[in-house]
Amino acid sequence: MEQREENTERIHRERRKRQSSSIPKTTTLLCPLDLILEILLRLPVKSVLRFRCVSKLWLSTTTDPYFTNSYEARSSTRPSLLMFFKNKDKLFVFTFPHHNQNSKETHSYSQHVDSYHIKYPKYCCFPFTESVHGLISFRISTKPIIWNPTMRQFLILPKPEKSWKGLSVFLGYDPVEGKHKLMCMNRDNTSDECRVLTLGSAQEKWRRIKSNLKHRSILRYYGQCINGVIYYQAYIDQMGFISNPTIMSFEVRSEKFDTITLPSGSFANMLIPYQGRLACVNNTMDDVNGGITLWTLEDAEKHIWSCKLFLAPLAHYDRSLKTDFKLDGITHAGEFIYVLSTFLKSFYVLYFDPKKNSFRKVEFRGTAYEVFRLSHGLGNKKVNRLYTFSHHVTSF
């Protein structure tokens, strides 16, 4: 890590020297490089990518590891909500920030959406997944795919194992080394090994990693990578008998497995990050007793969980909305994020603040315009499946 910082600083010293030497002596440098970088760090990512086409100097500046790391670090403190839906062979992608509101009143406002569309690889399968430090994983049959929404690029990776007919894919990120790793397992059978690939490595080869337990991931639930650890639900093979669901953890840096017992008598509809920790959410929709049970992992080694109960927040806001919205996650500020499962023209997001017991409604105008819909062949077609990622950040 220290070596990387030294190399980055050396690159900047050389660039300053090269830049100053190219300027005539009679010319005064009005804008120092440090100030330029600070300005660039505050710009939207779309503007930064455009500047790469201005000149070689701008390209060099905006692709320098110091700048990209700084930009990504700043973005990670302000995650966005990313959504997309499929139409024929294209993905229609929308991103917008989570705005914290201080008002105690239930209110709504509109916001324009940053959107684009992109053609995706043929036969691509879109399972439930998450955005991990700016990257999202999919698959084509038994070939994993990595998608970078910021750069609008897809990377198709080789098969991790030729004999596997089914594949479970988990994407992780090591914040210490700044590396993404892909961990894949046989989807159909219990196994005590997996395949791991480090993205961006020189040879990008799959490595065989042993687990301490034979297990199989539960397909209907996706994993979460939190602070360099991948968590996912699984069944453990105990001498030929399949156990009740448990949580497996995979530390991205050390590539070690461990198990975490679920809270007694509970199950998890979904795993989410909550205040920097793993949380299990049980979301029931019963009119009388419905609500959200949130179990937060306090100590992974001792399997200690804390519990909070939130009574049917959607029912208190509007009972008619319960079947239209789904819980997608929790913001850094502790607000529950509810998104529409389907929509026709415009769509909106509900944020519930349990501390203030208040809702705010954010309506987005990006798909409401008839010109937008007609120009992209959407017409009056209803979107029946909206994919959402509540903690998306920029990744170059």
From Swiss-Prot:
SUPFAM superfamilies: F-box domain (SSF81383). Residues 1-12 have a biased composition (Basic and acidic residues). InterPro entries: F-box-assoc_dom_typ3, F-box-assoc_interact_dom, F-box-like_dom_sf, F-box_dom. Pfam families: F-box, FBA_3. Residues 1-20 are annotated as: Disordered. Residues 26-73 form the F-box domain. Signal peptide: none annotated. NCBIfam families: F_box_assoc_1. This is Putative F-box protein At1g50870.
